[in-house]
Amino acid sequence: MASSLDSAALTLSNLSINGDFASSLPNLQKNLHLLSPQQVELAKILLELGQSHLFEHWAEPGVDDNEKKAFFDQVARLNSSYPGGLASYIKTARGLLADSKEGKNPFDGFTPSVPTGEVLTFGDDSFVSFEDRGVREARKAAFVLVAGGLGERLGYNGIKVALPAETTTGTCFLQSYIEYVLALREASNRLAGESETEIPFVIMTSDDTHTRTVELLESNSYFGMKPSQVKLLKQEKVACLDDNEARLAVDPHNKYRIQTKPHGHGDVHALLYSSGLLKNWHNAGLRWVLFFQDTNGLLFKAIPASLGVSATREYHVNSLAVPRKAKEAIGGITRLTHTDGRSMVINVEYNQLDPLLRATGFPDGDVNNETGYSPFPGNINQLILELGSYIEELSKTQGAIKEFVNPKYKDATKTSFKSSTRLECMMQDYPKTLPPSARVGFTVMDTWVAYAPVKNNPEDAAKVPKGNPYHSATSGEMAIYRANSLVLRKAGVKVADPVEQVFNGQEVEVWPRITWKPKWGLTFSEIKSKINGNCSISPRSTLVIKGKNVYLKDLSLDGTLIVNADEDAEVKVEGSVHNKGWTLEPVDYKDTSVPEEIRIRGFRINKIEQEERN
């Protein structure tokens, strides 16, 4: 023991420690014999980084010794999970905190302009052609779901991906996503004349969601995917910062822990890089990586065409986007050109875009053009990256994404914080480090077909000004029925107009409750090919299609029809179907006798009568 104590003491005495640290060292010095050489190295790093305060409250040897070792386990984790380690984290933090204190504008020197991209109209020839190309490319793609969040903000205590996307079938978001990927795989392999290729599916989890995500997958047999296709990558939190010197915050509940908070979904890039998956995919001939977030029930309707755009235009980065009203609370995709010649195409948050435009020769700021929309399309955080250039970029950055810091200051002097802060990063900021030669574009699709996130609880949604999107479980479910109704309309079905109803204080359009499995209708041309004759669906109807080869011909539906078909069975659905159907019954979100996932919608489905065809 004496020799390890001597060597540890020697290591510490070799440090160039100035007087500032002296007061904190006795507590550490007394405990050095407890530490391994690696832990002594970590202590050395912390002292060199000006973090001696972390040891000020350490007890005498023999008291809390296990907690002291656990402290270094945490430090080792924080050091290894961040590109460049804690030294890099603290150096970056000091720079960003100094900029924040000075009020530096990250956009100084940049002039915004409208980038180039593809604006698609659902169902026209160009759209159909891009969809076809996208399905062909899908077997060369990997899908990455960023799912680190709980549903607390929604008034739901589970993980967000376990929430039903719609309650007609009760299909949760994760099941819906996996079934779309499986349908894409099957369709893409069929076009390529082979059946072996599997599409990789990665889920980024967090401490909050990891175990429950595993349980959801395992208890549902991975929703039909092979377990080997699915990889979970868990993101670690980052250290909190107490002041402008980036002193690490001590956890208020345990003096032997550093307080930590989530770093943001930008971590997905570093996790993919360190996992080795990207190289494996590249060696297997993959070309694309698609990133998407956890609660948008429409996004896969937009993916085939967007992937087709990436392949046709040879984009290194393709951001999916929707038309955006000027000043709408959604980031705008913008080209920024610096006075030094640098340029990049990135998402600029809506509260930064208007002042940036006003400051750079656009006196009116962010305004709608002749189309009725802002020329800067709305970012919906779904990205398609070309794998080769992605690997090339990450080999330079190790997946580190340009970060930001958002301290809440106590007063105008900006010398102290109301509470600890931390560095954050966003997945969509990946293009910030790309060279000007990178081909960065976007694909715009109508909101009704591409974007219906579920992120607000009923109380917050009810306060949203009329005409603005609620982004609640209520509006998210109604958006799925609306999209499916409009797709069938475009395919020639007479779908009745919606009726207005109020649930949980939100006025929504209630369309016929139409749902289908992805394998029935992955693309518009496929859906169109399965509809013949004169079909009509009344406003109170529900149509559920669970099968691939289901054909609608001269169907008149007024009520509820569920069509179940085995994999290879061909089912023709014809004639008139009339029954009492299923109704929507309002429920109050405060009624705790109703399950959370139902009451946050404000309605439950009352299944009175239906016809099933098998």
Curated annotation (Swiss-Prot):
Stored Gene3D superfamilies: 2.160.10.30, Spore Coat Polysaccharide Biosynthesis Protein SpsA, Chain A
Pfam family, one: UDPGP
MF GO annotations: UDP-N-acetylglucosamine diphosphorylase activity; UTP-monosaccharide-1-phosphate uridylyltransferase activity
Keywords: Nucleotidyltransferase, Transferase
Enzyme Commission (EC) number: 2.7.7.64
Cofactor: Mg(2+); Mn(2+)
Disulfide bonds: none
Reactions catalysed according to its record: a monosaccharide 1-phosphate + UTP + H(+) = a UDP-monosaccharide + diphosphate
Record field: transmembrane: none
Domain of life of the native organism: Eukaryota
InterPro entries with a match to the protein in the record: Nucleotide-diphossugar_trans, UDP-sugar_pyrophosphorylase, UDPGP_fam
A single BP term in Gene Ontology: UDP-N-acetylglucosamine biosynthetic process
PANTHER family reported in the protein's UniProt record: UDP- GLUCOSE PYROPHOSPHORYLASE, UDP-SUGAR PYROPHOSPHORYLASE
Role summary: May function as the terminal enzyme of the myo-inositol oxidation (MIO) pathway. May also play a role in the salvage pathway for synthesis of nucleotide sugars. Can convert galactose-1-phosphate into glucose-1-phosphate by carrying out both the Gal-1-P conversion to UDP-Gal and, following an epimerase step, the subsequent reverse reaction of UDP-Glc to Glc-1-P.
Family (UniProt): Belongs to the USP family.
Protein name: UDP-sugar pyrophosphorylase
Species in which this protein is naturally found: Cucumis melo
Gene coding for it: USP
